[in-house]
Amino acid sequence: MATASRKKKKVKVTPEGTVHIKASFNNVMVTITDTLGNTVSWSSAGKNGFKGSKKNTPYASQVTSEAAAKEAYDLGMRYVDVLIKGPGSGRDAAIRALQGVGLEVRSIRDITPLPHNGCRPPKRRRV
């Protein structure tokens, strides 16, 4: 017996929120939350069709950021604070894409965790 497909609830969100951008060496993830921290929309490079080494390019970061921002903009979000984490290559492209969609960026903070001489880093690549 087939069950009826459920429609997603379209809930209006507050016009303010936070964009969390995690740009690692291998991937880019963008999560947009409201002021309470509830997820409004999210996107990643893999979700947008990028595979392998193409996931860590600035273009993949731009497409990923646009996808998450459009969804949040359609739900009523207008002003965002940006939190960036990680050393990835697409950090700047992601912020420019947010502004291109129409979200007004109020502040940008870098929250990349830095060790106070903790674990030994991976060995250097010899190419």
UniProtKB/Swiss-Prot annotation:
Gene3D superfamilies: Ribosomal protein S11. It comes from the Bacteria. Keywords: Ribonucleoprotein, Ribosomal protein, RNA-binding, rRNA-binding. InterPro entries: Ribosomal_uS11, Ribosomal_uS11_bac-type, Ribosomal_uS11_CS, Ribosomal_uS11_sf. The keyword rRNA-binding applies. One of its GO terms (molecular function) is structural constituent of ribosome. One of its GO terms (cellular component) is ribonucleoprotein complex. PROSITE patterns: RIBOSOMAL_S11. Part of the 30S ribosomal subunit. Interacts with proteins S7 and S18. Binds to IF-3. NCBIfam families: PRK05309.1, uS11_bact. Belongs to the universal ribosomal protein uS11 family. This is Small ribosomal subunit protein uS11.
